[in-house]
Amino acid sequence: MDDKKAANNSEKSKALAAALAQIEKQFGKGSVMRMEDGVIAEEIQAVSTGSLGLDIALGIGGLPRGRVIEIYGPESSGKTTLTLQSIAEMQKLGGTCAFIDAEHALDVTYAQKLGVNLNDLLISQPDTGEQALEICDALVRSGAVDLIVVDSVAALTPKAEIEGDMGDSLPGLQARLMSQALRKLTGSINRTNTTVIFINQIRMKIGVMFGNPETTTGGNALKFYASVRLDIRRTGSIKSGDEVIGSETKVKVVKNKVAPPFREAHFDILYGEGTSREGEILDLGSEHKVVEKSGAWYSYNGERIGQGKDNARNYLKEHPELAREIENKVRVALGVPELAGGEAEAEAKAS
């Protein structure tokens, strides 16, 4: 009985080996592999969002490489700010980035203030949704672009709608366009390790009596294909005297295929500056005993770095290498990978 079972297993092994050889011959080496052999089980790489709290909430230290990301929320909630900060972080690591501006509303001066190197940024302002997604597909397939932002899904207007009359009803056209594009894109995105971020807007479903009436544009395809979905909301204003200088922001990780979902991050977005990263470092540093807080004074390794949060934040801005050191200690304390990029990134921050 055992001999018969062994012979049967041997036949199966031979048949499997022949099938694998045939598949590799037809589709190339690595098209099928055992889990222990390969690249599949490699640790997921990440790029920082520019917000320490959000990097921690994402569980892997930032947005995953080689995946589709969706960031959605109401108007002026910080969606574009978050993507521009991610572009700046990717550029600090030596990556190439592209911004597909379907809304034709990119503020290049603001992008520069957030640390984006405009000389190295590829920008496209397409006329139709098809053109935008074809450009995105070509950039992904090139394998030479590390991060692509599409701003926004709502502005990806199908060609038939642009060429038609104003009152024409074309139901489901944009949803079909997104579904087809994502079917084409996902394989290439994974193979080339390109991160593609789609910014999306919120709409209200009519006649919803129970449950959440909010939905995102472009159908359901993006919800399924996205590895990470971030819901960003403005929760309050930051004032200096009577003047509003920024907004308090909450981001919820609604979907996460690379770490546990439903975590939240709270941070400040200052107008003209972006996320107050140094403020986050101080808050999380004191919370996890990396930075000592005594009264109004903040200290690190026994040395005082400032009286009051504003002074301590300014001190860390002037000493980026110290800010980086504290941030990495906070990341280690929370079990999140340290920042990549080393001295080059610290120099970029200083300049």
From Swiss-Prot:
Keyword field:
ATP-binding, Cytoplasm, DNA damage, DNA recombination, DNA repair, DNA-binding, Nucleotide-binding, SOS response
The record's SUPFAM superfamilies line, in alphabetical order, gives: P-loop containing nucleoside triphosphate hydrolases, RecA protein, C-terminal domain
A Gene Ontology CC term for this entry?
cytosol
Binding residues for ATP? 73-80
Q: What up-regulates or down-regulates this gene?
A: By methyl methanesulfonate.
An example of a GO molecular function for this protein is: damaged DNA binding
- Give the record's family classification: Belongs to the RecA family.
Can you say what this protein is called? Answer: Protein RecA
Give the originating organism: Herbaspirillum seropedicae
